[in-house]
């Protein structure tokens, strides 16, 4: 008897290419990796990327790793190289208002589906970072710490992170005072102090507890001085 998809045997091999190599050996390529940026932020979009790399490792991508472990300069250097050398890539942005409407987990799953659907080629297998994504058109596997374990997920993490960081830097100009270019919408002390002083802006996730609390405190102060 045969089964589909075939059983994948992960052998000890070179670094981040282990999973993709194992899947390719069983005829399940091309392999797409999917990752997000901004899940833990309280402002700005959730950005999701999908990426399919060529089977043969390329020198320009040798420094690929989890985007959070890379310096900003390294990410910026890898970003155009990934887009140039990848067989296919796709980036999806889910705005803060949609995150509020459907919730961060659903937004993450739906964004991953959209990113995979946006690829210029149909993947034979999809590796996702951290959790299962139902509704994909290809077999998939959630990989804990995937952005540090599979090159295609690491590439997707860089695409998502750099794209989102640039969006947040631009947002700092349209919504000055919050420091978005510095903290990228995450709940740092600098951001929380600005949120307390200014109240939420349209790019904040209005259903998040700390954003709600800041809005309430601002209204209370306005009531006392009104």
Swiss-Prot record:
Its EC number is 3.1.26.4. Residues 29-220 form the RNase H type-2 domain. Manganese or magnesium. Binds 1 divalent metal ion per monomer in the absence of substrate. May bind a second metal ion after substrate binding. One of its GO terms (biological process) is mismatch repair. Keywords: Cytoplasm, Endonuclease, Hydrolase, Manganese, Metal-binding, Nuclease. GO terms for molecular function: manganese ion binding; RNA binding; RNA-DNA hybrid ribonuclease activity. InterPro entries: RNase_HII, RNase_HII/HIII, RNase_HII/HIII_dom, RNaseH-like_sf, RNaseH_sf. Its cofactor is Mn(2+); Mg(2+). The keyword NAD does not apply. It is an enzyme of class 3 (hydrolase). It is found in: Cytoplasm. One of its GO terms (cellular component) is cytoplasm. Belongs to the RNase HII family. Endonuclease that specifically degrades the RNA of RNA-DNA hybrids. This is Ribonuclease HII. It comes from Rhodococcus erythropolis (strain PR4 / NBRC 100887).
